[in-house]
From Swiss-Prot:
Disruption phenotype: Cells lacking this gene are not able to produce glycosylated macrolides. Involved in the biosynthesis of the macrolide antibiotics methymycin, neomethymycin, narbomycin, and pikromycin. Catalyzes the attachment of dTDP-D-desosamine onto 12- and 14-membered macrolactone rings 10-deoxymethynolide and narbonolide to produce 10-deoxymethymycin (YC-17) and narbomycin. DesVII is unique among glycosyltransferases in that it requires an additional protein component, DesVIII, for its activity. DesVII can recognize and process not only cyclic substrates of different ring size, but also a variety of linear substrates albeit with reduced, but measurable activities. It comes from the Bacteria. One of its GO terms (biological process) is antibiotic biosynthetic process. It catalyses: 10-deoxymethynolide + dTDP-alpha-D-desosamine = 10-deoxymethymycin + dTDP + H(+). DesVIII assists the folding of the DesVII polypeptide. However, unlike chaperones, it remains bound to DesVII during catalysis, forming a tight DesVII/DesVIII complex. Although the formation of the DesVII/DesVIII complex is essential for the catalytic activity, DesVIII is unlikely to be involved in catalysis directly. Belongs to the glycosyltransferase 28 family. It is an enzyme of class 2 (transferase). Keywords: Antibiotic biosynthesis, Glycosyltransferase, Transferase. Forms a complex with DesVIII. InterPro entries: EryCIII-like_C (IPR010610), EryCIII-like_N (IPR048284), Glycosyl_450act (IPR030953), Glycosyltransferase_28 (IPR050426), UDP_glucos_trans (IPR002213). This is 10-deoxymethynolide desosaminyltransferase.
Length: 426
């Protein structure tokens, strides 16, 4: 069959598609990957055939223009699972009102959607697999009649939030049932003579790489898949060939700690200083500008701009990180206890779930201090039950099939869900 994968142009969102794309290719299927031009080199660098569509999104420019305003990586975007209070209509509608223009009009801009639909009409895929915010993939499938599914990169906060939003919406008086996302997709589909269906937001089915005990109960048809890490093109450093002489701890926050942690004064330097007296080997992923701020740190510290997590983490006793999808999932499959400094997007959901399983610690902004980070690391190193829980999660993860293992199920589901093109269904 022909399989079209699509992600908006953000490399970490794309990375989660790569192992599945290769599994399909190795099984003999034709595979194409479509995204805005900015991702073309990343796609071809992963060994897959790229289809540039539309113009590059303006998300980064939008962030600058909207500085200080709520946006999807702003604490105002708190999904129900990460909030102590129940989700109400005003909050749910507020989330939708922010997400609709941010992801739906920018990440899936009109030129991208138009070009993707044109390519799908020409190439006629049997199955479209889309990154969970790249709704252009669902639109292209709806127009051409291809089966389609989301490929998640973490707990299904979008599917869960959508289900709860729809339930709250339907309780409102008819004149107050606003739905910005459905309205946008309805207008978009009108251009191609197709109509909106709720499954355009959740897929006809969902491929979920989250371990079952960490999964959200969305009630949606789901295919479990073992997470396989992909870090892009990378080189394994020589020093990883030798086992560490003392417990190895990784510190990686992805971007500057002040940005990730909301500028509350807890910096990477503060954290390093709190760990300075521990007998550990610390591997800290900091660039040159970040290192310049560091004054006091553990004696056995290795600074590096980048190291592939799948190569580093098997040798680690703990990891301190911000809850990024790839870092979290790679820690899970390597049974590494996690200290998660989680605030944004789905990170609190993941961190709370890991902590509830006993496989790590969740430090939300209100509880985050350098001493709290140090205490969590010491607990992990001193309490073997944390490592035991992390190993339990790893074993659970290995109970799911690999990307190659789900290919027969994808073949079956594609045949089940394929339909005639939209213009032939009316």
């Amino acid at each position: 069959m022909r399989v079209l994968l699509t992600s908006f142009a953000h490399h970490t969102h794309y990375y989660g598609l790569v192992p599945l794309a290769w599994a399909l290719l190795a099984a003999g299927h034709e595979v194409r990957v479509a995204s805005q031009p900015a991702l073309t080199d990343t796609i071809t660098g992963s060994g897959l055939a790229a289809v540039p569509v539309g113009t590059d999104h303006l998300i980064h420019e939008y962030r600058v223009r909207m500085a200080g305003e709520p946006r999807p990586n702003h604490p105002a975007i708190a999904f129900d699972e990460a909030r102590p209070e129940p989700l109400d209509w005003d909050h749910a509608l507020g989330i939708e009102a922010i997400l609709a223009p941010y992801f739906h009009l920018l990440a899936n801009n009109d030129s991208m959607v138009d070009d993707l639909v044109d390519f799908a009409r020409s190439w006629q895929p049997d199955l479209v697999l889309w990154e969970p915010t790249t709704y252009a993939g669902a639109v292209a499938a709806q127009v051409t009649g291809a089966a389609h599914a989301r490929v998640l990169w973490g707990p299904d906060v979008m599917g869960s939030a959508r289900r709860k939003f729809v339930a709250l919406r339907d309780r409102q008086p008819p004149e107050h049932r606003e739905d910005p996302t459905a309205e946008w997709l309805t207008w978009t589909l009108d251009r191609y003579g197709a109509s909106f269906e709720e499954e355009l937001l959740t897929g006809q089915f969902t491929i979920d790489p989250t371990p079952p005990s960490l999964r959200l109960d969305t009630g949606l048809p789901t295919v479990g898949m073992r997470y396989v890490p992909y870090n892009g093109t990378s080189v394994v450093p020589d020093w990883l060939s030798e086992p560490p002489a003392r417990p190895r701890v990784c510190l990686t926050l992805g971007v500057s700690a002040r940005e990730v942690l909301g500028g509350d004064g807890v910096s990477q330097g503060d954290i390093l200083e709190a760990l300075a007296d521990l007998d550990i080997e610390l591997v800290a992923t900091l660039d040159a500008s970040q290192r310049a701020e560091i004054r006091n740190y553990p004696k056995h510290t290795r600074f590096t701009d980048f190291v592939p997590m799948h190569a580093l983490l098997p040798s680690c006793s703990a990891i301190i990180h911000h809850g990024g999808a790839g870092t979290y999932a790679t820690a899970v499959i390597n049974a590494v206890p996690q200290v998660m400094l989680a605030e944004l997007w789905d990170a609190p959901v993941k961190a709370r779930a890991v902590a509830e399983q006993g496989a790590g610690f969740f430090l939300p902004p209100a509880e985050l201090t350098p001493q709290a980070v140090r205490d969590a690391v010491v607990r992990i190193l001193d309490d073997p039950s944390v490592a035991t829980a992390a190993h339990r999660l790893r074993e659970e993860t290995f109970g799911d099939p690999t990307p190659a293992g789900i290919v027969p199920e994808l073949e079956r589901l594609a045949a089940q869900h394929r339909r005639p093109p939209a213009d032939a269904r009316h």
